[in-house]
């Protein structure tokens, strides 16, 4: 085991001579290979003992099941992870899934900085470098991934470590082809072997941490919490204002958990009146009420073995809260109109934009249920508190909108600056709506300042709220955006170019706002 106090010494020793010694020992191990799993485990031991590569992992891809499985994992005695070989990755999922999908090496100076890092093994030091390289099979198709922690903390040493691991990966891949791949693949090069190049996109990609954008301290902390809580069945309470992405958090937790292959069922507790809520969630028997012509399973039964996301839990009634508490405590329920007790195995992720502590104090929310739900709270900050993420979010959303519209879109630096001056009371949802509206207005494919329109007229960006002429006293700061524009037009004699100068805008921006805000221009 390599202690952190020895890390500086070990880094200095990792030179060409040490690499050669490690490579020689690995070649001996591979030349004597008789059993794949045992051989790969011995290779990882050499990487750990002689090449100072911690927590080495070798994953192999099964194209029939479309999964990447851990074949060998180097662990220390005090970090043994039971069932590690049962952990699976889909192509494009996490760091190793990305390497498999792209067929290219991945080097991270600090592993936790990458949003695709899932940490399902709970072995890795978040502050250490991470290197993952593909194992290339016949016809340049990846058949697996070799990954490890590099003890070389200095970034300038990482390229040498990467080249060393790529060489080791080539040796491993050759051995795997001889031991695992069927001989028919070698005899028929035109046929696809059992292990094929994976598809670049899979349905799970929309739910991974790579879909969570932001490098602010608050978002880094949230991503770390998601990695940790995903491994367990702990009940999670996601809190935050409307539009902050609470459902996205729930999706990420489920799809990176051991329950990922099971159902993820969503339900909005405020969407139905109380008399229909219980039937929708718990199901009903035939004849339970007028219109119940057949038995129907509820959301809890549909989510059995998986995850149930209860949005707006703070809006639920007292009777529903009592039944939910029973399920959380005992895992039991009955359908409406039935007397058969059903057992369900469901993980609950709840979300609310309410201050539940105050609701408990007022008697609107059960205190015992509050403590049952609040086992692992995740508080999402509003967008105005992480303005450093707005630029990255905007570029991400523009790419998403461009894909949905089937065209090329770009956003200018000026538009980004304007977005960063707005306080976004509707949070990320409002930002996405704003950019989608701007994309529709952008005929050239460039989203610039002149096509950016905001929803909240009482919360204009600084570019419109503050301008030189306002000091003359003619522009009342209490006016909303439409009223400001009309005031400027009246001041300018309804000449759009003059009004634009008064507001610090371009004539095109003024023209767009006149059209969108339905301002009638007098005939001069």
Curated annotation (Swiss-Prot):
Q: Which GO terms describe its biological process?
A: nitrogen fixation; phosphorelay signal transduction system
| PROSITE patterns membership | SIGMA54_INTERACT_1, SIGMA54_INTERACT_2, SIGMA54_INTERACT_3, SIGMA54_INTERACT_4
**Which portions of the sequence form the region A domain?**
1-182
Which terms are listed as keywords in the entry?
Activator, ATP-binding, DNA-binding, Nitrogen fixation, Nucleotide-binding, Transcription, Transcription regulation, Two-component regulatory system
- Keyword Oxidoreductase listed? The answer is no
Q: What residues are annotated to bind DNA?
A: 496-515
Outline the segment boundaries, as ranges, of region: C-terminal DNA-binding domain.
482-524
Q: What sequence ranges are listed for the domain GAF?
A: 35-176
Listed GO MF terms: ATP binding; ATP hydrolysis activity; DNA-binding transcription factor activity; sequence-specific DNA binding
Q: InterPro entries per the record? A: AAA+_ATPase, GAF, GAF-like_dom_sf, Homeodomain-like_sf, HTH_Fis, Nif-specific_regulatory_prot, P-loop_NTPase, Sigma_54_int
Domain Sigma-54 factor interaction span(s) in chain numbering: 212-481
Which residues of the sequence carry a binding annotation for ATP? 240-247, 303-312
Pfam families cross-referenced by the UniProt entry? GAF, HTH_8, Sigma54_activat
* Assembly: Interacts with sigma-54.
Tell me the NCBIfam families matching this sequence.
nifA
* Role, per record: Required for activation of most nif operons, which are directly involved in nitrogen fixation.
Q: What is this protein called?
A: Nif-specific regulatory protein
| Annotated organism of origin | Klebsiella pneumoniae
Q: Please spell out the taxonomic lineage of the organism that makes this protein.
A: Bacteria, Pseudomonadati, Pseudomonadota, Gammaproteobacteria, Enterobacterales
Gene responsible for this protein? nifA
């Amino acid at each position: 085991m390599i202690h952190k106090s020895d890390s500086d010494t070990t880094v200095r020793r990792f030179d060409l001579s040490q690499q050669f010694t490690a490579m020689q020992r690995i070649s001996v191990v591979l030349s004597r290979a008789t059993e794949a799993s045992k051989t790969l485990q011995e290779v990882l031991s050499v990487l750990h003992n002689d090449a100072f590569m911690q927590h080495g992992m070798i994953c192999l891809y099964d194209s029939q099941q479309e999964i990447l499985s851990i074949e060998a994992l180097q662990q220390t005695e005090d970090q043994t992870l039971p069932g590690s070989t049962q952990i699976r990755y889909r192509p494009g999922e996490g760091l190793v899934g990305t390497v498999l999908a792209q067929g290219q090496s991945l080097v991270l100076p600090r592993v936790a900085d990458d949003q695709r890092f899932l940490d399902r093994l709970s072995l890795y030091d978040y502050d250490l470098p991470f290197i993952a390289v593909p194992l290339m099979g016949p016809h340049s198709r990846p058949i697996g991934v070799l990954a490890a922690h590099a003890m070389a903390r200095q970034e300038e040493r990482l390229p040498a470590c990467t080249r060393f691991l790529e060489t080791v990966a080539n040796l491993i891949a050759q051995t795997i082809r001889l031991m695992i791949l069927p001989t028919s693949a070698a005899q028929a090069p035109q046929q696809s072997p059992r292990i094929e190049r994976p598809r670049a996109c899979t349905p799970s990609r929309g739910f991974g941490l790579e879909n969570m954008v932001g490098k602010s301290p608050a978002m880094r902390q949230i991503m770390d919490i998601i990695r940790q809580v995903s491994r367990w069945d702990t009940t999670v309470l996601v809190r935050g204002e409307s539009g902050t992405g609470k459902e996205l958090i729930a999706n990420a937790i489920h799809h990176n958990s051991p329950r990922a292959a099971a159902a993820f069922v969503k339900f909005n507790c405020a969407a139905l009146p109380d008399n229909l809520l219980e039937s929708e969630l718990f199901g009903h028997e035939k004849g339970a009420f007028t219109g119940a012509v057949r038995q129907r399973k509820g959301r809890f039964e549909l989510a059995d073995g998986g995850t149930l996301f209860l949005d707006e839990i703070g809006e639920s009634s007292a009777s529903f809260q009592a039944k939910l508490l029973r399920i959380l405590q005992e895992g039991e329920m009955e359908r409406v109109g039935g007397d058969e007790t059903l057992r369900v195995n469901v993980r609950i992720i709840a979300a609310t934009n309410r201050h539940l502590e105050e609701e408990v104090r007022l008697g609107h929310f059960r205190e015992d249920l509050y403590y049952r739900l609040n086992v692992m709270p995740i508080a999402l900050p509003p967008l105005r508190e992480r303005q450093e993420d707005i630029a990255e979010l905007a570029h991400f959303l523009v790419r998403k909108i461009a894909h949905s519209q089937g065209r090329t879109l770009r956003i200018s630096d000026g538009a980004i600056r304007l977005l960063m001056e707005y306080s976004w009371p509707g949070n990320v949802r409002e930002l996405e709506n704003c950019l989608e509206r701007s994309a529709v207005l952008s005929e050239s494919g460039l989203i610039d300042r002149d096509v950016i329109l905001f929803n909240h007229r009482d919360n204009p960006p600084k570019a419109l709220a503050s301008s030189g002429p306002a000091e003359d006293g003619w522009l009342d700061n209490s006016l909303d955006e439409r009223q400001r524009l009309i005031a400027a037009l009246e001041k300018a004699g309804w000449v759009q170019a003059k009004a634009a100068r008064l507001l610090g805008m371009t004539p095109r921006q003024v023209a767009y706002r006149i059209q969108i805000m339905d301002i009638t221009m007098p005939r001069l």
